[in-house]
């Protein structure tokens, strides 16, 4: 019986995206095992035989030593075509893994959450019982590492305040967009997907729930509005109305055809992806909140 043991590194969004190409991997192997820092993502996918947390080799060493097992530790970010922005991350992964895929309608597959994680189902129900059945989900920050605990001069802990976070990016534009969404859809609650150290916004509900809960909530969400971030991957193919705001990255490399994509205008963007050349010189002109809102109101997927 053929089997493979795949290591998937990187952040939450990248790991969720990998589930999109697991059907092709499952055609090649009878059993598919995954090692990941987000192993719960892969336990939630029916194409995975089992998944293990990274760094706990005792859990999968017998599988790795099996003569019928292929060890697959491939990194799509190092793929030459991807670095040169000549293909989607799907295609880069497939090329590195030696499999063929059809990327036209790929979306993440998390079809076993209800079976594997009953607590997530209960939490999703609690959220809907609290905010109601009419809601919109938003995310405007990529995941940042939590800041270190703060102390005063005497060593006493200082309560965290997200307004102290140093890198503000386009946070003020996010509040402006939220205000526009709230004005256009006054009967809908706005659920804000963010880490504790990321900004909070007025007229939103910031939840403290496992990320898989958002995949379940997306099934009933009226709309999702987000940047190129982990939420995009958690909801694509589940929520029928997703607007994704793109900065220097592009939907033809990281996105999904089922979504509405609005891209920043790059005055200069000559650098390859994930270059060892320091900060990008790209001058990114983000769309205005008003421009994004026009896309949010549209109903058809595509690039705007």
Where are each of the predicted segments found?
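Catalytic machinery of carbohydrate-active enzymes
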Residues: 1-304
């Amino acid at each position: 019986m053929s089997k493979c043991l795949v290591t998937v590194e990187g952040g939450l969004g990248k790991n969720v995206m990998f589930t999109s190409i697991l059907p092709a991997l499952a055609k090649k192997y009878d059993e598919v095992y995954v090692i990941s820092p987000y192993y719960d993502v892969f336990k939630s996918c029916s194409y995975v035989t089992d998944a293990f947390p990274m760094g706990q080799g005792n859990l999968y060493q017998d599988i790795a030593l099996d003569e019928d097992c292929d060890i697959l530790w491939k990194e799509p970010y190092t793929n030459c075509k991807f670095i040169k922005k000549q293909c989607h991350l799907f295609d880069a992964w497939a090329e590195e893994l030696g499999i063929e895929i059809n990327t036209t309608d790929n979306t993440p597959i998390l079809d076993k959450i209800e079976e594997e994680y009953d607590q997530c189902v209960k939490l999703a129900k609690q959220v809907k019982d609290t905010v109601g059945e009419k809601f919109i989900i938003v995310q405007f920050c990529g995941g940042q590492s939590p800041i270190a605990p703060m102390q005063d001069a005497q060593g006493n802990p200082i309560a965290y305040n997200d307004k102290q976070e140093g890198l503000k990016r386009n946070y003020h534009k996010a509040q402006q967009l939220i205000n526009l969404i709230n004005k256009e859809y006054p009967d809908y609650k706005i659920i804000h997907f963010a880490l504790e150290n990321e900004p909070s916004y007025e007229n939103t509900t910031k939840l403290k729930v496992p990320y898989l809960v958002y995949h379940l909530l997306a099934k009933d969400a009226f709309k999702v509005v987000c940047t190129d971030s982990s939420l995009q991957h958690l909801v694509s193919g589940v929520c029928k109305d997703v607007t994704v705001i793109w900065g220097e990255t592009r939907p033809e490399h990281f996105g999904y055809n089922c979504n509405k994509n609005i891209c920043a205008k790059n005055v200069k963007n000559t650098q390859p992806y994930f270059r060892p050349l320091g900060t990008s010189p790209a001058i990114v002109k983000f769309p205005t909140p008003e421009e994004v809102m026009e896309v949010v109101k549209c109903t058809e997927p595509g690039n705007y």
